[in-house]
Amino acid sequence: MSTPEYSTSAKSRFDITNLTTDPFVVATWSVAMISWVIAFIGSIVANIEGSFPRFTWWGLVFQLLMLVFLPAVYCFDVVEWYRLFLTCGYSIAFIYTTNSATNLVWSGGSATGAASAGVILLSMVNLIWVFYYGSDNASPINQWIDSFSLRGPKRSSVSPFHNSRPISHDKYSGSENDEFKHSSWNNQRYMSSTALSGLENVSQGDTLETTPFNSPDHDGLGTNITAGGTNITIDEFPYTARALYNYQKSPDDENEISFEKDEILKVNDIHSRWWQAKRANGEIGICPSNYVELIE
């Protein structure tokens, strides 16, 4: 399984709004920082008053490093690069904090009680982060959480090019990629392999005639194929969808399209995470399915 590539130059600029526009991260990180301060101060006082489990200190230091790292990856917009690291890191932090809670919760004194309360809260936040960063952005829970973000849902980590879209095969073309770049995605009319099922053996002498999107002869985009005296009309974009959020296409994927919130799109191939779509201006490309909703 391949993963999408990101441009370092486009993704490495510091922008704090990447963090502040995500209420889930702001809320959980704030709770974690307050919990860490409580646990740290309680641990200092408990250590002064008497014996204190020394391994807890390393757990608190490791937790602090992870807490500092999280806002950094958001501000530089490189979260997708470090999802695996975040999942593993917070899993380790969860083990440390739960172990510290076990040692502290049964100890007497108000200081150890405060420290145990802090590490218990940290354990809860760590577990939430493990589930969140360990899940794909297209999962139902992540989509629900990201729906509160001002930037909208995040991209799925599954590559749209290799895993979601059917590729049109041309027996006269030497390369599928070349056909894709020079034929399908330069606003030329094309037909997917799904639509051509059973019609692949059209001879060179047969004619292929395409009807424009806004043609008065058809309500939707259609393709007329004349093969052996047979007329067949196929609607390439039979569905209509409305954009739920603004979407800016990735600079590294020329097959994507940008669109604005509430824009109406014509789509097909709705059984995957990335849909083939056509804008009103005739631009054709792919869009993430969690950014749009079908209206007919």
Curated annotation (Swiss-Prot):
<keyword id="KW-0346">Stress response</keyword>
<comment type="function">
    <text>Plasma membrane osmosensor that activates the high osmolarity glycerol (HOG) MAPK signaling pathway in response to high osmolarity.</text>
</comment>
<dbReference type="InterPro" id="IPR001452">
    <property type="entry name" value="SH3_domain"/>
</dbReference>
<feature type="transmembrane region" description="Helical">
    <location>
        <begin position="84"/>
        <end position="106"/>
    </location>
</feature>
<dbReference type="InterPro" id="IPR035522">
    <property type="entry name" value="Sho1_SH3"/>
</dbReference>
<feature type="topological domain" description="Cytoplasmic">
    <location>
        <begin position="78"/>
        <end position="83"/>
    </location>
</feature>
<comment type="subunit">
    <text>Forms homooligomers.</text>
</comment>
<keyword id="KW-0472">Membrane</keyword>
<feature type="transmembrane region" description="Helical">
    <location>
        <begin position="24"/>
        <end position="44"/>
    </location>
</feature>
<keyword id="KW-0812">Transmembrane</keyword>
<keyword id="KW-1003">Cell membrane</keyword>
<feature type="domain" description="SH3">
    <location>
        <begin position="236"/>
        <end position="296"/>
    </location>
</feature>
<keyword id="KW-0728">SH3 domain</keyword>
<feature type="transmembrane region" description="Helical">
    <location>
        <begin position="55"/>
        <end position="77"/>
    </location>
</feature>
<dbReference type="GO" id="GO:0005886">
    <property type="term" value="C:plasma membrane"/>
</dbReference>
<feature type="topological domain" description="Extracellular">
    <location>
        <begin position="107"/>
        <end position="110"/>
    </location>
</feature>
<feature type="transmembrane region" description="Helical">
    <location>
        <begin position="111"/>
        <end position="131"/>
    </location>
</feature>
<feature type="topological domain" description="Cytoplasmic">
    <location>
        <begin position="132"/>
        <end position="296"/>
    </location>
</feature>
<dbReference type="Pfam" id="PF00018">
    <property type="entry name" value="SH3_1"/>
</dbReference>
<dbReference type="InterPro" id="IPR036028">
    <property type="entry name" value="SH3-like_dom_sf"/>
</dbReference>
<feature type="topological domain" description="Extracellular">
    <location>
        <begin position="45"/>
        <end position="54"/>
    </location>
</feature>
<protein>
    <recommendedName>
        <fullName>High osmolarity signaling protein SHO1</fullName>
    </recommendedName>
</protein>
<keyword id="KW-1133">Transmembrane helix</keyword>
<dbReference type="GO" id="GO:0030833">
    <property type="term" value="P:regulation of actin filament polymerization"/>
</dbReference>
<comment type="similarity">
    <text>Belongs to the SHO1 family.</text>
</comment>
<feature type="topological domain" description="Cytoplasmic">
    <location>
        <begin position="1"/>
        <end position="23"/>
    </location>
</feature>
